[in-house]
Amino acid sequence: MVLDLDLFRVDKGGDPALIRETQEKRFKDPGLVDQLVKADSEWRRCRFRADNLNKLKNLCSKTIGEKMKKKEPVGDDESVPENVLSFDDLTADALANLKVSQIKKVRLLIDEAILKCDAERIKLEAERFENLREIGNLLHPSVPISNDEDVDNKVERIWGDCTVRKKYSHVDLVVMVDGFEGEKGAVVAGSRGYFLKGVLVFLEQALIQYALRTLGSRGYIPIYTPFFMRKEVMQEVAQLSQFDEELYKVIGKGSEKSDDNSYDEKYLIATSEQPIAALHRDEWLRPEDLPIKYAGLSTCFRQEVGSHGRDTRGIFRVHQFEKIEQFVYSSPHDNKSWEMFEEMITTAEEFYQSLGIPYHIVNIVSGSLNHAASKKLDLEAWFPGSGAFRELVSCSNCTDYQARRLRIRYGQTKKMMDKVEFVHMLNATMCATTRTICAILENYQTEKGITVPEKLKEFMPPGLQELIPFVKPAPIEQEPSKKQKKQHEGSKKKAAARDATLENRLQNMEVTDA
């Protein structure tokens, strides 16, 4: 995931100042741009020198061949004139005045210089890439410039009644319909582990079927992705911070052979976007085949580092969940990817409108965008039981930022003298099932249970097509008694502590009096 290096090269029509401005608008270090430009300039000089040295080496070989053909004496003198050692002034005429033995010595010295130059070039290339991969994509002009998404995310539009309030939050409702085992899930799987069961399993499957059917009717190809990816491929689709904060690493045998003791490092996917992005890695995509639209279905795995204390109960923010994703490869020409961007967010909106979930669309501030996104719109649903908007959908246009690292090119082959173009890649959530379930539970709650949304009824089993009944009391209504019990126990402990302190004081007084 990187920008085009030519954007940093003034002589290639690039504008480093524009990229510095983008970094500043993203509230990231603009100094990375200067470091990259410096490393790239040195790299280009080094490559130019290496090219010249290789030409000189070839010239040496050619001159030796000509002298041998003329049967000139080889000679045994390996001393080389000072003016030849600089290589910069080395010409065919200068070589012609040397013996074969001297030219061989020059060629050997050139080989050493090439090795030294190559080592320096590799070092500079690594330095350049380290900076390049931490510089974000160019921003779309409509992105709000701010580093505070809580205040400055721009609301683009609202659908439905986002003021209504209801009694219970999803944390209580998943228990009331007996569709969730949280404590046992945590014992088995650790923090945020859970079992989804009973009616909520059917509701999740209904959402998956409805989402896939909706996308299928719009020309999307359903695709069920691998759950893990090789490290070298994941490095091409994920930014560096994700390896520390989001991705789970899996270590396994390198092959199925029993005598193979090698180990392979892989990463569990955080979204089907990652494997689908790599699906056409190293390919040329024909213009007439675009756009290619995929409806990705996968289980997703996320560490959620940095979210400690947030949404610790229920199923809204968990380490493992199912998700249907929109992913599109688009033409880089004629604003096609931005037209597709609007189409994808519209598809998501119409899906949630059909489910009767109120929401607003927010334009995410520059400081909260990941490196790849040129622009991101979120669909945040209204949760009437929680009294808050919660994110259900993220829609991003990454332009050619991802495709460049994955080498997914636009066109059939590289034409002579033409610059290679890369496809644009876009992604948008269609349905993260656990979050959508939470939104449905809060919006469709009644006194007796959860009314099943009209569009999901045909996918639910008999007896659950109209109403999902409450079968357990709300945990929040049991909590006061628990709190009172804890308060009572706390009062007893405090009283015991006071008594112990008083007794100690009395004993001290007795000792003093004595």
Swiss-Prot record:
Compositionally biased intervals (Polar residues): 504-514
One Gene Ontology term of the molecular function aspect: selenocysteine-tRNA ligase activity
Localization (cell): Cytoplasm; Nucleus
Extent of motif Nuclear localization signal: 482-494
Predominant localisation class: cytoplasm
Pfam families assigned to the protein according to its UniProt record, in alphabetical order: Seryl_tRNA_N (PF02403), tRNA-synt_2b (PF00587)
EC numbers: 6.1.1.11
Pathway as given in its UniProt record: Aminoacyl-tRNA biosynthesis; selenocysteinyl-tRNA(Sec) biosynthesis; L-seryl-tRNA(Sec) from L-serine and tRNA(Sec): step 1/1
Record-listed N6-acetyllysine modification sites: 323
Binding locations of ATP: 302-304, 318-321, 391-394
UniProt modified residues of type Phosphoserine: 241
Domain of life, per lineage: Eukaryota
Modification N-acetylmethionine occurs at: 1
Catalytic reaction equation(s): tRNA(Ser) + L-serine + ATP = L-seryl-tRNA(Ser) + AMP + diphosphate + H(+); tRNA(Sec) + L-serine + ATP = L-seryl-tRNA(Sec) + AMP + diphosphate + H(+)
One of the protein's GO biological processes: seryl-tRNA aminoacylation
Positions of region (Disordered): 472-514
Compositional bias per record (Basic and acidic residues), positions renumbered to this chain: 479-502
Domain characteristics, as noted in the entry: Consists of two distinct domains, a catalytic core and a N-terminal extension that is involved in tRNA binding.
Subunit structure: Homodimer. The tRNA molecule may bind across the dimer. Interacts with SIRT2. Interacts with METTL6; interaction is required for the tRNA N(3)-methylcytidine methyltransferase activity of METTL6.
Job of this protein: Catalyzes the attachment of serine to tRNA(Ser) in a two-step reaction: serine is first activated by ATP to form Ser-AMP and then transferred to the acceptor end of tRNA(Ser). Is probably also able to aminoacylate tRNA(Sec) with serine, to form the misacylated tRNA L-seryl-tRNA(Sec), which will be further converted into selenocysteinyl-tRNA(Sec). In the nucleus, binds to the VEGFA core promoter and prevents MYC binding and transcriptional activation by MYC. Recruits SIRT2 to the VEGFA promoter, promoting deacetylation of histone H4 at 'Lys-16' (H4K16).
Database matches in NCBIfam families: serS
Protein name: Serine--tRNA ligase, cytoplasmic
Classification of source organism: Eukaryota, Metazoa, Chordata, Craniata, Vertebrata
